[in-house]
Every structure is written in structure tokens, then in C-alpha cells.
């Protein structure tokens, strides 16, 4: 079975088209062209702002003209992650999709259902002539995944809707009424390159096989973080043996839990077998710790060519200690909503850069703004104590739940009517663009909902096929049921 054989046909048709268009964050040009061509083909009114956000407008169907304007919103960019050994150019290659039982996934890469399925649903709605709805506006934002820059750049008056349906949630049957705010903290270490010695032997230490995942929606699962595992081993090594750190690299994206990390070290030949034994014992500990969530974790040590330089020992020691001390994971749970993560932090990436610098990327989230700032300052303090330069990003606001939301009530009623069961009303620890929309449009009545996705922001990303039809049915029933102004 192929993606084009799936039901509802019109949604999967457009999702397939979306997967054929490269759309990395900050490189959405081809996607913008695709959407503009769609609007031209279907004679849909369209406008674009300076950031590249697109808004398509469609009049009400006959008899629905007195309904309020509804904005449907999704982001057009996708997280670009692939497995080691997977050959894929995200700037140019289409995503290869595979129907795998009850799920649709990609072939060794992220699928881009986050948030391509939302884009597809909007296009299906715009292209259809047999769906009842009031006046609608479909908003497609850019660069949600790496900075929310599209939502931040949105100007007052660009859209006119009174109600906004965000299509960027990942559990069918759950309706979201709030989300966390976020802030990034970056640390930069400066080091002196020291010529390596031919009296040492050099080895690459790898951490791989982890699932990774979304650092908001999946932080509560206790998934392994490759950066933390690698640094934990280097810390143990530092306590027992003399070695030099030549290079270190781990993770990629601020909003993804690191799946892979590696370091190149130099050892005295007489210590190499003892270090292998130490690594094997450590690997056994990690495998035991993660057996329920990351059973495929692997740690490996292989000989490698002698690098030209290593990081000066004083900086390497401070780097290892600071990374080991840097908090990662859930910091606190909500006292207002049972089961909701309130505050968390993600040690996202470790990258060696030009100018003899090492850049550490971290991301903090909280549904309470003061807690978000507090954990960002905790992370900053860890690196400041080690002599690093630290800076914070601007961050983005959370979306405070509104229990009196009219659209929430309609969404609950329509779900119950369709499926004879109650939808779960939730807040999400992940960041959504909704908080930024409220800054510019404070009277917006909003909810977020979507089909079931798993392992987003990783090559294991997949979408549960049957839930797309359920979500689509709910969306259509909801649009039909919104009362006159």
C-alpha cells in the first residue's frame, strides 16, 4: 500500500504533495512557491508578509456567510534529521514515505508530518467544494521549528479571524488549550589548540542507537540524551586516566533530544585496554538504565587517525565538568494540571566552531514565565562558573489556558457527538505559536488539535494512519457547527 491509497483521499493526496517539497526551517522558499502555485490553480486569494508567512482566504459556503471568520494555522517548515548512513539531501530531495502497518513513516529521515499534515488538511479544505464552513483564512507560518520567527514577525491586521484552530498537536482525541513558553541559552567556550603527541593513541567514542524525540512533548519519558551519556563517560575517564580531548560533537536541534554524540580522545597506550573495560562497564550501566525507553543504545570505542590538535587541558576539564553538571530533563511538574510537565531543560547540542570555540545549545521550557527564567539562569550559571560566555535568546511566551473558551466548548461537543466519548482537554509542554498570536491578537479564541504522531523531530517520526480520518472528521464537524456571530 502507498500513501496515495490511504483515506481520507484528499488529505493524504496533499500530504504526499507536501512531502515532495523540500522545506527545512529557514529554507522554505520551495514550499512558498508550491503554496503560491496551489492558490493560483484553485483561484484562492493569497497574500504574503515580509517574513514569508502566507494567508489564503476562502469565502463561506452558501448559507454560512453569517459565521465568524475562522483561521486554520500550521507551519510549513519541518525538522530535518536523518540516521547515520542515510543518504538524503533535505535541501533538494523529497521525503520517501513508507506505509508500515498502522503507521506512515519515512525511510531513515524525519517524516515532516509535524506540521505537514496540518498544511495538507488546510489545502484539502481550500480545494474542496463540498465542505460546509463559514469564511476561513488559512495561515501558513515559516520557521516554527528553529525560532518561531514567522509567528514572531506576524503583524496586526494580517489576518481577520476571531477564532484560530492550530493544527500542530500530536494526539488524536486530545484538545489543547495551553502550552509552555520557551527560552534558549547558549554557552561558548574558547580554547587553545595544542599540537597532539605521537606518543599517544587516538580513539573515537560514540554514543548512538537512541530514539531521540521532541524536547517538549517527550521530555517526560526519560529518554537517553547522547550528550549527557558521552560527557558522563568522559567525566569518569577524567577521574581515572590522563587523556586529551581532541574534539566533541553531539545533537543538532534545540528542540530535539540528542540521539548521537561522539568525542575523539588521546590515550597513553598502556591505558587503552583499561579504558575499553571502563567503557564496557559503563555501557552496561547505561543499557540497564535505559532498557525500557532506549533498548538499542550503543557505546563504541574505535581507533582513529591522530588529529593535528587537541583542546587545551584546562578548557577541556572545565567543559566536561560544566556539561556533566548542566541539568537536563524534567525540572518540575504542574500543580494545576495533573501529569503536565511544568518546567524542563534540554542539553541539545555540542558543536566545535571556527575560531577555536565550542558552542553549547540548550533550551528551557515552562508554563510559568518566572520558572522559565529561573531554569535558564540555572543553566547559564553552570557555564558561567566554568568561564564560558553565555547568552539567552528572546524566547517566546506560553499560552495561558482559557477554561471559558467558546471554541473549546464547541470542539468538546462535536467530538462527543461524533465519537460518543469525551475528548481529553489538555495543555502541552511543547511550545506552540499560539502564545505569540495572542500577543498580536489578544481577543483570539484558540484551540490546538491534530492526529497522532510519535517520535517527532527524529527519524523514527511516524503518524497513525487511522487517526487522520478521525481528526479530519472532527475538523469538518467543528467548522460546520460554529454558530452565527
Predicted feature residues:
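Zn-dependent metallopeptidase/amidohydrolase metal-coordination segment
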Residues: 3, 8-11, 335, 342-358, ...
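Midchain, well-structured core segments that form catalytic/ion-binding scaffolds
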Residues: 102-105, 145, 152, 156-365
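Acidic/His- and Gly-rich active-site-bordering loop/insert found
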Residues: 2-103
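Glycine/charged-rich beta-loop-alpha catalytic/anionic-binding loops adjacent to active sites
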Residues: 95-109, 211-213, 416-421, 452-456
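His/Asp/Glu-rich mid-to-C-terminal helical/loop segments that flank catalytic regions of hydrolases
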Residues: 157, 223-240, 268-272, 318-324, ...
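Active-site metal-coordination/substrate-binding segment of hydrolases
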Residues: 64-146, 151-162, 199-202, 313-317, ...
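Active-site-adjacent substrate-binding region
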Residues: 225, 232-248, 393-395, 401-444
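Acidic, glycine-rich active-site loops and adjacent beta-strand->loop/helix elements
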Residues: 76-78, 139-147, 169-172, 211, ...
